Regions:
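N-terminal ligand-binding lobe of clamshell/alpha-beta domains
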Residues: 1-171
Length: 171
């Protein structure tokens, strides 16, 4: 795969796990949700990868702004979309999916929001397979699972009747 389209800008970190320093090289288009909804976060990414600012935007920050025509014109080989997205096209956008597929664009759905403990490793493994980055995906998933087990192990050692701590994660 030489040409990638992200159906949500906020999927950029997942792509970066696999692409690393080569992040913008294959990315031909993405939604503009990342920079509009998290300008400081996007600014950090664009400082590290200035080429991101040159990547075509195929919409703003909601699925209704996604332009099928712009996306198809970029000639991506694969469109990576978020399951139940909200910021980009999702599995419920049948017409958009049909147009992308009719143009010969493979469509892949990943999920880091609806069931992250179950779907994060699955999504990274799928991306690794699709993008030819299996080794990078396996390395991440191995580390991710080990860190998750470390947290779960500590929670199992809490004395009976002790409430588990509440945790909020933000990237």
């Amino acid at each position: 795969v030489d040409r990638i389209l992200l159906g949500e800008g906020r999927l950029l970190p997942a792509l970066a796990i696999l692409e690393q320093a080569e992040l913008p090289r294959r990315l031909v288009g993405m939604m503009g949700d990342f920079e509009s909804l998290d300008a400081p976060g996007y600014r950090q990414w664009s400082q590290r990868f200035p080429q991101l600012d040159k990547v075509a935007r195929v919409g703003r920050n909601n699925s209704g702004s996604f332009s099928d025509e712009q996306a198809i014109a970029l000639r991506p080989q694969v469109a990576i979309l978020g399951l139940g997205s909200g910021h980009g096209p999702s599995q419920s956008h049948r017409e958009t999916l049909s147009r992308l597929e009719a143009a010969g664009i493979a469509v892949v759905f990943i999920d880091f929001r609806h069931d992250p403990l179950r779907n994060t490793p699955r999504s990274l493994e799928l991306l690794g397979q699709v993008l030819g980055k299996r080794k990078e995906a396996e390395a991440f998933v191995t580390t991710w699972k080990a860190e998750l087990e470390r947290v779960q192990s500590r929670l199992r050692t809490l004395p009976a009747g002790t409430a588990a701590p509440t945790v909020f994660l933000e990237n």
